Amino acid sequence: MMALGVAMIIVDATIVNVAIPSIIRDLNLSLIDAEWVTTIYSLVFAAFLITLGRIGDASGRKRLLLAGLVVFVISSMLAGRAPNGGLLIGARLLQGFGGAMMLPATLSIVNATFRGRERAIAFGIWGSVIGGMAAVGPLLGGWLTTAHSWRWAFYINLPIGIVAFAGVTAFVTESRDEHGRPGFDLPGFLTSSIGLVGVVFALIEGSRYGWVEPTRLFTIGSWEWPLASLSPVAPAFAVGVTSLIAFYMIERRRSHAGRVVLFDFGLFGLGSFRYGNLAASIVSLGELGMLFILPLFLQAVLGYSAFRTGVVLLPLAIGAFMGGPTAAHFANRYGPRRVVTAGMGLEAIAIASIGVLLSLIHI
């Protein structure tokens, strides 16, 4: 049931990309509005992920997951019924917030529910769902857009969300961080949210609006960026980095004082945590980066349809679904370090091979 919630989050991050041309035609969107339909989801998701995860640890992870499912389903319905770009962007904002509620809740519930070998298998399934559904998203979006309407790319979340809500209610046990300190880290929340929004915005929009000198006008609704000689990306990035540095200093000071923190940076003192996150980041950059670029190349350069593009990406989903449980089995037998090393090597070979093949096809 939790896998269904994770699946909705990941699918919605990728399904819209192949539906955007149809959305632009149907709602008569400007290119700027279309860009915000995809961007706002990632911005809100990144901004609230840490904070909402901490709230779930304190108030109840199952409760947060159920609330996130409700928000996500309602916002999906609003997105599907949106009569104009403004309401669609607002619905996508709510979707990002709902996703930020669900993802940390599912991860914490898995960690609290399973032990030993079962935990490794559960995390393997959790990871395979993320990797697999990231590839299924374009296929599902292409089929729904081609066979029905782009609105069904959002409506599909309604039955899935209802089934997930019923399953979580019936089968998932409530859990909390019993050893957590009481209170809420407001300074940490503000600095982390501002920092993540600023940095993520800059990374997403830097190539579009220019990092320093503006290459196009930045607008939100009727509001226009007032500085003609400076892109909004540079100030956003500077504010984001400054806020994240402040977040680090605030969290370290609060931790030393014995006060509640949003994130314990002392965890990076553990080699397994530090290098595990580094490995996960490298894998995500490779897989998710390819999932963003490859559909654009297939459709814009090779002339593939949205559905055919999804079919090309389907083997990635199959491999991800099979790889999660298999990796858990091999990790128990040979040790996680060898499995991670082998997996990263396979991914490097695969991505390099795809790059060579695409260059030959393009020639």
Question: Residue locations for each model-derived region?
Answer:
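Hydrophobic transmembrane-helix bundles of small-molecule transporters
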Residues: 146-278
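Transmembrane-helix bundle of Major Facilitator Superfamily
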Residues: 1-171, 323-327, 333-334, 338, ...
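Acidic-residue sensor for enzyme active/binding pockets
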Residues: 57, 99, 174, 205, ...
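Juxtamembrane/interfacial segments around transmembrane helices
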Residues: 126, 146, 186, 211-215, ...
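Residue-level signal for the membrane-embedded core of alpha-helical transmembrane segments
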Residues: 47, 101, 194-197, 289
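Transmembrane core module of solute transporters
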Residues: 1-45, 49, 149, 226-236, ...
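Hydrophobic alpha-helical interface/terminus motif in multipass membrane transporters
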Residues: 20-23, 110, 144, 172, ...
